Curated annotation (Swiss-Prot):
UniProt-listed InterPro entries: Globin (IPR000971), Globin-like_sf (IPR009050), Globin/Proto (IPR012292), Hemoglobin_b (IPR002337), Hemoglobin_oxygen_transport (IPR050056)
GO molecular function: haptoglobin binding; heme binding; hemoglobin alpha binding; metal ion binding; organic acid binding; oxygen binding; oxygen carrier activity; peroxidase activity
Keywords on record: Heme, Iron, Metal-binding, Oxygen transport, Phosphoprotein, Transport
Quaternary structure note: Heterotetramer of two alpha chains and two epsilon chains in early embryonic hemoglobin Gower-2; two zeta chains and two epsilon chains in early embryonic hemoglobin Gower-1.
Tissue expression remark: Red blood cells.
Protein family: Belongs to the globin family.
The keyword Transcription regulation is assigned to this record: no
Keyword Phosphoprotein: yes
Name this polypeptide is given: Hemoglobin subunit epsilon
Amino acid sequence: MVHFTAEEKAAITSLWGKMNVEEAGGEALGRLLVVYPWTQRFFDNFGNLSSPSAILGNPKVKAHGKKVLTSFGDAIKNMDNLKTTFAKLSELHCDKLHVDPENFRLLGNVMVIILATHFGKEFTPEVQAAWQKLVSAVAIALGHKYH
C-alpha cells in the first residue's frame, strides 16, 4: 500500500480542484492514442483514429477521456485504498478487455504531462512528485488483477 503524506494529498487535491475533467480527460486519452498508437487497438469502435487531428477531435475519445479522468477523481477521494477502489476496473481491463497493464503506466505519465501543460509554474517539482506517486499507485492498482 502506498502512503501519501498530508503535503502530497494537499498538492494533489489542490490541483484537482482546478481541473477541467472533460477537457483534460479528452486531451490525456487523445495524447495516449497519438503518442502510443498501439493503444488504439482497444478502441476499435471509436471511429476515425487515422491522424492526430482525427483522434484529438473525436467525440468518443473525449467522452471516454472524461470517464477515465473521473476515475482519477475516485483515486483522489480514496488515496489510502486504491486497490479496493480500482478492483472492478482492474478485473474489467484484465478479464474482458485484455488491456496490457503497461498502458496504465503510460496513461499516468501522459496525465502528468497534461497537468504540467495546464498548470505551468504551479506544477512545481514537489507537486509533480506527488502526482507521479499517485498515477503510479493507480497503475499498480489497475494492474492488480493481472498478478
